[in-house]
Amino acid sequence: GLRIGVSAAKGLSYALNIPLISVPTLEALAHQIEIPKGAIVAMLDARRMEVYSAIYDANYNETRATEAEVLTPDSYQELLKSSIVYFVGNGVAKTKDLITHKNAQFIEDKLPSAKQMCALSYRKFKSNTFEDVAYFEPYYLKDFIAIPSKK
């Protein structure tokens, strides 16, 4: 689905001679909450005990790039020692059972919203932050593996 959506957006961008803007899902997810201080860990469930996550400060500056990680009880312990950490996204369900640090705050039932994506897109538009239509590809943390149909 993502490859098809990106291909359609690139085609429209090229044909209509309009800019292409991308909004990372985890960034849009981080913007779903406002915090006075501390860190935001935006996370998406990646099956089993794995999540895709990125870390942002209270001003939404990315402090750790997106990565795939296997959750353990020791995950994020260094960060939790120094500040309150707000975990947001559908990866929270599995995280809250593992991480019991007093500085961990779990915010459930938040998904990236169209409102936040529009606001982030508008900010990129105003700052002329556009993708190169010829070279833009969706960002995958794992290699795509096509599975042949069983029919």
PLM segments and residue spans:
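Glycine-rich, flexible loop/turn motifs
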Residues: L2, L29, I40, T66-E67, ...
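Glycine-rich phosphate-binding/hydrolytic loop that grips phosphoryl groups
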Residues: I107-Y139
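Buried hydrophobic packing segments
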Residues: A8-L12, L29-A30, M117, S121
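DPxDG-like acidic metal-binding loop motif
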Residues: G1-L20
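Catalytic-loop motifs flanking and including active-site residues across diverse enzymes
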Residues: I4-A8, T72, S113-M117
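Basic, gly/Ser/Thr/Pro-rich low-complexity segments located predominantly at protein N termini
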Residues: V6, K10, K94-K96, V133
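Surface "functional belts" at beta-alpha junctions
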Residues: P19-P112, Y140, I145-A146, K150
